[in-house]
């Protein structure tokens, strides 16, 4: 890339789901050149491709061989299953995946240059996020590619870190507790409130204050209520049944 800016790189996205959609749009807005989007679903591939002014395909064998960087953002099982087909004929490019739970060595034996570009955030197609505050964790098998991935991530975010596969696995697990399990608690709360004719909106100030607290306090110090003692004594019988079940 000597003499050229990183924005001149030709990038292909393998996947057009929640993360891929947000990441591709963010890169496009920063001037990066997205040349193609692949998805098994035509609607998803076409919609994202139109947004970032790229070509699209729903056939793996039609994925361009001309891109310099391939960003794979698929469900874990699909990625592992399709990996040999995905890289076929394109082994000399730089390949990265965006998964928190998949180690970098998944690429070994398939491509020479490889790494990970992991933005740790929850993504939805319908909701755009501020990438400036999203932590990116990068890893690469070659130091020059680590620097390149850091430069790409730094074009989007102020928070860019190197992390090993082992570290990233722990990050991902912590993120599951912080986000996915927390949201599942909201689902249980919403079901309980609905059963008794109460609006979930009543919980929003509580949710917001709980989140704000941990910006200033350690999570343990911020904990209040029966959970401090892991006690269900002061929780009503209907709620106890929900928690226990």
Regions of interest found by a model, annotated:
Residues 2-56:
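NAD(P)+-binding Rossmann beta1-loop-alpha1 motif at the extreme N-terminus of oxidoreductases
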Residues 5, 10, 201-236:
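NAD(P)-dependent Rossmann-like dehydrogenase/reductase catalytic/cofactor-binding core
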């Amino acid at each position: 890339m000597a003499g050229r800016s990183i924005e001149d790189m030709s990038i292909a996205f393998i996947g057009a789901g929640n993360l891929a959609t947000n990441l591709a749009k963010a890169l496009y807005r920063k001037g990066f050149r997205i040349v193609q989007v692949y998805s098994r679903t035509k609607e998803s591939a076409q919609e994202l491709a139109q947004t970032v002014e790229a070509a699209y395909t729903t056939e793996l064998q039609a994925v361009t061989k001309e891109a310099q960087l391939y960003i794979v953002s698929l469900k874990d099982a699909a990625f592992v299953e399709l990996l040999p087909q995905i890289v076929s004929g394109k082994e000399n490019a730089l390949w990265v995946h965006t998964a928190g739970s998949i180690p970098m060595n998944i690429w070994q034996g398939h491509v020479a240059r490889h790494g990970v570009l992991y933005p740790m955030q929850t993504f939805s197609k319908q909701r755009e996020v501020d990438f400036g505050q999203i932590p990116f964790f990068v890893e690469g098998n070659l130091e020059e590619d680590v620097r390149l991935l850091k430069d790409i991530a730094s074009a989007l975010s102020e928070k860019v870190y190197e992390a090993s596969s082992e570290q990233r696995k722990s990050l991902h697990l912590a993120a599951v507790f912080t986000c996915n399990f927390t949201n599942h608690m909201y689902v249980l709360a919403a079901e309980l409130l609905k059963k008794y004719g109460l609006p979930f909106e009543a919980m929003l100030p509580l949710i917001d204050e709980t989140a704000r607290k941990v910006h200033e306090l350690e999570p343990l110090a911020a904990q209040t209520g029966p959970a401090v003692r892991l006690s269900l004594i002061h929780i009503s019988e209907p709620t106890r049944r929900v928690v226990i079940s």
